[in-house]
Amino acid sequence: MTDTNVNIIRLTAAEIAAKVASGELTAVQVTEAHLARIDAVDEKVHAFLHVDREGALAQARAVDEKRERGEKLGPLAGVPLALKDIFTTEGIPTTVGSKILEGWIPPYDATLTKKLKAADVVILGKTNMDEFAMGSSTENSAYGPTGNPWDLSRIPGGSGGGSSAALASFEAPLAIGTDTGGSIRQPAAVTGTVGVKPTYGAVSRYGMVAFSSSLDQGGPCARTVLDAALLHEVIAGHDPLDSTSIDAPVPPVVEAARNGSVEGMRVGVVKQFRGEGYQAGVLQRFDESVALLKELGAEIVELDCPSFDLALSAYYLIAPSECSSNLARFDGLRYGVRVGDDGTRSAEEVTALTREAGFGDEVKRRIMLGTYALSSGYYDAYYGSAQKVRTLITRDFEKSFEQVDVIVSPTTPTTAFPIGERADDPMAMYLADLCTIPTNLAGNAAMSLPCGLAPEDNLPVGLQIIAPALKDDRLYKVGAAVEAAFVEKWGHPLIEEAPSL
C-alpha cells in the first residue's frame, strides 16, 4: 500500500467526510484506498463475504460529481462502510451467512440500505456473520470463520464478527451490525471498536432478515464514539414499512458525542454483572473504568437486579421460539437454494431436504429448541414463563433508572477466545452474551467502547454503557467523555495498538 493509502485508511469517518467535503480528498481516492486494503489483508481476516468493487466506485464517483456541481453533501458523504450480510441490497448477494440463501440476489434494498445510499455513504460490500445471526464467534458462518485482527487465531465476536473485524483491520471506517443478544456490542468489545445497540424500534428492520423479531435491532459500528453517532443519525428514524418502528424524533446523538461529559451524572453498577466466569483482567479494566467515571465527576450507585441472573435462560427460550417461526419461510420453494426437486418428490420432501442441507447445526439446534418451547402443552411452561422473566427484567431496569442516568458493566465476561475453543460447547458459547442480553429483553439502548487491554493476554476489553429507551444520546455523552479520558491516559486511541497485519 502507498503511504497516502495508509494515511487515508487510518482516518476517522468524521475526518474523511470533512476532507471529501472540502475537496482535499476525493471519494474515489478514499474508496480505492480501502479496496486496496481489503485486497491486501482480507484473505487473512475474511471480514467480507462479498466486495462490491464496481458499485462502491460508482457511488464514490457520484459523490465527487455532486460536490463538483456544488450540491449539498450528506454528513458522511464519501465515507466507506461495511454492511452486515443480513440487510437486503438490490443486485448484490445477501446470504445471512447461510447456504440456504447462497447466491440469492434481492430485488430490493432494505430501508437501512436506502438511507445509507441517500446519505452518500459508499457501501464497500457485505460482511461475514454467524448464520442467521445465531452465534457469538462468527464460526457458525457457512462460509468459514473470520479472524480477530488483534490475533487471527481468535474470534472477532459474533454474530457480527465480519463488521467488527473490518473496522479493526482498517478495511472500513464504518460498519453496520445487528444486535439480538449482543451481536453488535460483544464483537466491538473483543476487537477494540465501538458498537451501539439503539433503542428497540429506533432503526428500521424492513429488509433485515429476521431472527427474533422482538429482539433484533440494527445499529452503528465504528472506531470512535463520534463516528458511531454520525452513522446512528443517518440510519435511525421512523419507517412505516416496519410495524415495530418507533415514531419518535431521533435523540440528539451527534450533539451528545461532541459534548461528552459525566459531570453530575449518576452511574449504576449492577452487582449481578460479575463473579464466576469473568476473566480477572476484564474485571480489572472494568473497575478502572468505574474509578475513571468517578474522577470525571460521576456519582457511582450500586444496583441490585436479581432478575438479570435469569436473563440468559429466558433469552434462550424467547429467541429460538421466534426463530423457529421466522425461519419457516425458508422452504426452498420461493427463493434461495432448492434441493431434491427432481420431479418425483412432493413439496414437503423438497422442503425437508432443502432445510436439512441448507441450515447449519446451530440454526437447526435453535429451530428445534424453539419448536419444542412453542409446542402444545409446553408453551406456558417455557415460552410463557420466559416472557414473565422478561417483564421482571424490564421492571428491574425501570427501578434502576429511577436512581441512575446510565448503567455500566463489562460488555462480555472474557476477551476473544481461540477459534474452535467453544465450538462443541454451546453453553460456554452462550455465556459470551451474559451482560448484553438483559438490554435486548428490555429494549433499551446500549454501547460498547474500548477500556483497555487485559493484562493476561493483551487483548481488548469493552465497557458497556446502558441507557433507558429513547435516551440513546446519554450513551454518546458518557461514551465520548470516557473515550477522551482514556485517549488522554494512553496517549492514543487503543486501536492504534492493533497489529498492522
UniProtKB/Swiss-Prot annotation:
The keyword Ligase applies. GO terms for molecular function: ATP binding; glutaminyl-tRNA synthase (glutamine-hydrolyzing) activity. Its EC number is 6.3.5.7. It catalyses: L-glutamyl-tRNA(Gln) + L-glutamine + ATP + H2O = L-glutaminyl-tRNA(Gln) + L-glutamate + ADP + phosphate + H(+). Keywords: ATP-binding, Ligase, Nucleotide-binding, Protein biosynthesis. One of its GO terms (biological process) is translation. This is Glutamyl-tRNA(Gln) amidotransferase subunit A. The lineage of its organism: Bacteria, Bacillati, Actinomycetota, Actinomycetes, Kitasatosporales.
